[in-house]
Each structure stands twice: as C-alpha cells, then as structure tokens.
A protein has these predicted regions:
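Short, basic (Lys/Arg/His-rich) helix/loop patches that form interaction surfaces
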Residues: 141, 241-280, 299
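Catalytic-site neighborhood detector that most strongly recognizes the C-terminal catalytic loop/helix
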Residues: 282-316
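Alpha-helix N-cap/helix-start motif at helix boundaries, enriched for small hydrophobics
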Residues: 87, 151-152, 159, 163-168, ...
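N-terminal core-binding DNA-recognition domain of tyrosine recombinases/integrases
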Residues: 16-119
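Active-site/catalytic core of tyrosine-dependent DNA strand-transfer enzymes
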Residues: 198-252
C-alpha cells in the first residue's frame, strides 16, 4: 500500500497525476487539465478534513455533503460530472493500490452525465453592450447610485463572478495603476488572478473606490449595502444588475451578473484573444465556457459541431 496517500494525500495525488493518471481513452492529461484536477482534488480534500473523513475513508454521504457546500450548491451538471469522474478515477486507483476497499463514486458515475444539450449562453448584443457602457459613464452623485453602477462596471468590465464581487476588498482594486487592475483572490478550486479593467469601467470604479474609502462602514469589502460591512447577497446583486439593464432597454431572459460575465467573455473573444487567454481572465481552468461562447461567433453549422464536441473536454 502507498502510505503517502494517508500521510500527505496532496503530494500523493500530485505524484500520481505526473506519473500515470490518464483519461478514459488512456491518453495522458494535458498540463492544463492536471492543474485543474489538482485544484479540484484539493478542494474536495479540504471538505473531507472539515467532516473528519480522509481519502481512505470517505463515502457517498461525504460526496452528497460536498454538493450541499456553499460552492457545491452552485455547480452545474457539467462540473458535478467532472468531480464524479475525478473521484471515480481516484478511487479505482486507491482500490488497486490497497488504500481503499471500495469505490463510493462508482454508483454516482452512472447517475451523472454530461447534459445532452446545454442552452446557448446568454449575453448582451454589441449594441446593448455599448449602451450599458455609455450608461456607466454618467454616474449619479448619491452613494447608492454610484455603488450600483460600480458593481455593474465590475461585472461588465472584468468578467468576475457574483461570489468574487462579494469577496472583493477595497485594497484589491487599483484603478490608478498602469494598466488599472483588480486582484481576484483565490477561492475554491480557483487560483488568485489579476484582471485588467476595461477602459470604460475605470472612471466609475475609481470614483467608487475614492468614495468608499471615506464612508463610515465596518470592514474592508469593496461593495457592501450595510453599515456593518456585510457581503452583498446574490439576490441584491441580481436586482442591481437587472435595474441597470432595464435602464438600457434590455429585455433578455436573464438580466444577471452571469450575463455580464458572458458579455465580457464574448467581447474578449471578438477582440482576438484566444480561448486559453480568456479562460485565464475568467479564472477558469477549462475552456468549456469560452468554447460555448465562441461557438456563438460561428456560422450555424460549425456552431452545432462545436457544441456537440464540447463534452470531450472532460478528458483533457
């Protein structure tokens, strides 16, 4: 038995990935996929530590609890499938080496599957994007209005998620740097990253940063609605984005932070950035999201081929 799995599972997983781990077709994983798998494994391992379980002892109840964690509740079907495939591959190896007696992921694997047809990602048209950018360039003087437009500018101008906006600190925003940027801190399986601010977002975020520093609010969150400095809820962020989109006449099905993130992604692709580059901007370790949005730039026939091929990324 390889005792390193019991004493240092992080190192054991890294060694196994580098030495022999491979996808279903027995092809070695790409360097990018190895990084993704290591981050996912570490995220799950930390979950087990909190529950008092180990790589050698966890069961289906621990996996079920993982889906109910704050991050897990927001996982898409595709992300859940990636995790189950990773755990199944891991447990089969641990059974083979004598570290485990069973594979609790095996029954989960038959229940999880790639979605047959994922909906086309929602985003603003170029005209709607331009209208929203123009809307952000004329901020009101009141604190609430300035804050709301700064929040919208952060989503549209950096592509961050709602969770990343909630967690952003005042010290993470550098609107006067050359070029201006936002530091997005590490969370879950995502590493820390630096995102350059789109030029249209700089004035409003600079104005909000200066105003926020003068407000008598507890804590150091960049965005908060309360004097005690609590993080903004998803519902409140959704309302703020929906209000701004209503102002420019947007009538799409999902006036949400995710739509603005998708718009940022599509704008970068239209500007000539590769899917690898844009995925890094978004903090993604897989190109799946970018590939789906890139498919919206293609002729219809080619788009269908790309969307149908997307699930193969799980074995990269």
């Amino acid at each position: 038995m390889d005792s390193l799995w019991l004493t240092n599972p992080t190192q054991a997983y890294r060694d196994w990935q580098a030495r022999e781990a491979a996808g279903a077709d027995r092809r070695p994983f790409s360097a990018r996929s190895i990084v993704q798998h290591q981050a996912m494994f570490e995220h799950f391992r930390r979950h087990l530590v909190v529950r008092g379980a180990t790589i050698a002892s966890f069961g289906t109840a621990d996996v079920d609890a993982f889906w109910q964690s704050p991050d897990g509740r927001n996982y898409s079907q595709a992300t859940r499938t990636r995790y189950v495939m990773l755990l199944d591959r891991l447990c089969r190896h641990l059974v083979f080496t004598g570290v485990r007696l069973d594979n609790p992921a095996a029954p989960l694997l038959s229940a999880e599957r790639w979605p047959d047809q994922e909906p086309t990602p929602l985003f603003l048209t170029a005209a709607e994007d331009a209208r929203l950018q123009a809307y952000l360039l004329s901020p009101p003087d009141d604190v609430a209005g300035l804050r709301s437009r700064a929040i919208v500018a952060a989503f549209l101008g950096t592509g961050i998620t709602a969770g990343e906006a909630r967690a952003a600190r005042l010290a993470d925003l550098w609107p006067d740097a050359t070029p201006p940027y936002l530091v997005v801190r590490a969370h879950g399986p995502r590493d820390a990253r630096t995102v350059h601010l789109a030029s249209f977002a700089v004035p409003i975020l600079r104005a909000w940063s200066a105003r926020r520093a003068t407000l008598p609010l507890d804590g150091d969150l960049l965005f908060t609605l309360t004097p005690d400095g609590r993080p903004i809820t998803d519902m409140s962020l959704g309302r703020i984005v929906a209000t701004a989109l209503a102002e420019i006449g947007f009538s799409g099905a999902e006036p949400s932070p995710r739509t603005l993130r998708n718009t940022f992604c599509r704008r970068q692709l239209l500007a000539g950035h590769s899917c690898d580059e844009v995925s890094q901007m978004l903090g993604l370790v897989s190109n799946r999201t970018c590939d789906r949005i890139a498919a919206t730039l293609m002729p219809e026939a080619k788009r269908c081929e790309t969307l149908q091929a997307a699930p193969a990324e799980a074995n990269e």
